Amino acid sequence: MKTFLPSKFIVDRIEDRCIKCKVCITQCSFDTHYYDEDDDQIKVRNQNCVGCHRCVTFCPTNALVVRNNPLEYRQNANWTPEMIEDIFKQAETGGVLLTGMGMDKAKPIYWDKLLINASQVTNPSIDPLREPMELTTYLGRRPDKAAFDNCGNVEENITPLVKIDVPVMFSAMSYGAISLNVHRSLAQAAKNMGTMWNTGEGGLHSSLMEFKDNTIVQVASGRYGVQNDYLNSGRIVEIKIGQGAKPGIGGHLPGEKVSADVSLTRMIPMGTDAISPAPQHDIYSIEDLSQLIYALKEATHYRVPISVKIAAVHNVSAIASGIVRAGADIVTIDGMRGATGAAPKVIRDNVGIPIELALAAVDSRLREEGIRNQASLVISGGIRNSGDVFKAIALGADAVNIGTAALVALGCHLCQQCHTGKCAWGICTSDLALTKRINPEIGAKRLTNLLRGWSLEIKDMLGGLGVNAIESLRGNRLHLRGVGLSAEELKILGVRAAGE
């Protein structure tokens, strides 16, 4: 069937710079560039270009330019080019449109409408270069009170808290969705910075057991790789109920990405689609969730906190309250801008709510019910920089997870082709010819640098507030002001308008 789809991008080659080295051909995993022997020229298939910029980055003579196709549709506010092209695709395939990464629509980004306070005159600021600043964060359940014996020993069992040196962790991204070299980069960077990385729902590769003190292992609806050794190889065990990019449906790893090594780790046949059920089939109520939480606590000998991850949806505050009362030590909330390796486009773009509103609502609800101390709040889904981290903690988060930002640090250009298994940067692929493009040592260094830079910036902002510890910022919304927000939005966020 002839396609009606135009090329998304046009690749221009500056001929007097091109030395015909064929680097562009070897670097492009989408067969955009090819060599024509008859004409002795390197030519381009524009329809294959996904805009990943791999060829541009590695061209030794800067001979390539990738630009948007200037093809213009007749202007129509209702029928945008994206709407038209989506219909073309479904008319040609008859299937669900899949995409990767997070929602890219122009929905409100509340981080950009929140501004941070600073000390002036009456409350002196602190110079982080000359005075100690504390970013250490503890995750887990804190008791209402502790009983001590005559020797000063605690009389009751308390779930151990997990200490992280920076309030930033790496989001759940499964082996298969991303390559083993990316997993190793994340794990090593987490160890370097004294924080945590998350295996995602695809199990833990045997070569990464050395990082178990910095590992969060996940139990999702597919239960891939879940067995006793796996559960006891993590510092935190996370039950995944949902994720921000696709609330209400299960994970989907195309068979093209299920290599021999991935199949061994996930405990599924090679080359088969790994389709997780939408629900966890042993969880249909808060009571069922509580049973699984305590089953995992028993399996791990009450040695580690149990986290429950949910998507930011309507009534999220009531759901989070139930999760805390069910016994969870950590609640992780993933917002609608959270990314994924593969999701139906219609769900990614239309389901869920912004993480800023969900976080503020959940923190307020738990405080009102007097149970905020019983669980830590971790949020994810759209954290782009240290300013977002700072504002999230002021809104009530104990820590944040980053996924897309971490992948960008490794070279991701957000071409949204994660689901194809052809990632030219070697990130979201199981193709051994592509995965070797990620050097784990260099990747770990880049991620370590990212977190170290953010840590320094957070300390600068804390110092500007006159605060020397991240705990003094947590949930302190008086340090935030809103700009361009409605009265209802300000009320939900719990912040005042700028100027008040």
Curated annotation (Swiss-Prot):
Alphabetic keyword roster: 4Fe-4S, Amino-acid biosynthesis, Flavoprotein, FMN, Glutamate biosynthesis, Iron, Iron-sulfur, Metal-binding, NADP, Oxidoreductase, Repeat
UniProt keyword Transit peptide, yes or no: no
Binding site for [4Fe-4S] cluster 1: C18, C21, C24, C59
Cross-referenced CDD domains: GltS_FMN (cd02808)
Sequence ranges assigned to domain 4Fe-4S ferredoxin-type in this UniProt record: 7-38, 40-69
SUPFAM superfamilies registered for this protein in UniProt: 4Fe-4S ferredoxins (SSF54862), FMN-linked oxidoreductases (SSF51395)
Enzyme class: oxidoreductase
GO molecular function list: 4 iron, 4 sulfur cluster binding; glutamate synthase (NADPH) activity; metal ion binding
Requisite cofactors: FMN
GO biological process: glutamate biosynthetic process
Family: Belongs to the glutamate synthase family.
The protein, known as: Archaeal-type glutamate synthase [NADPH]
Gene giving rise to this polypeptide: gltB
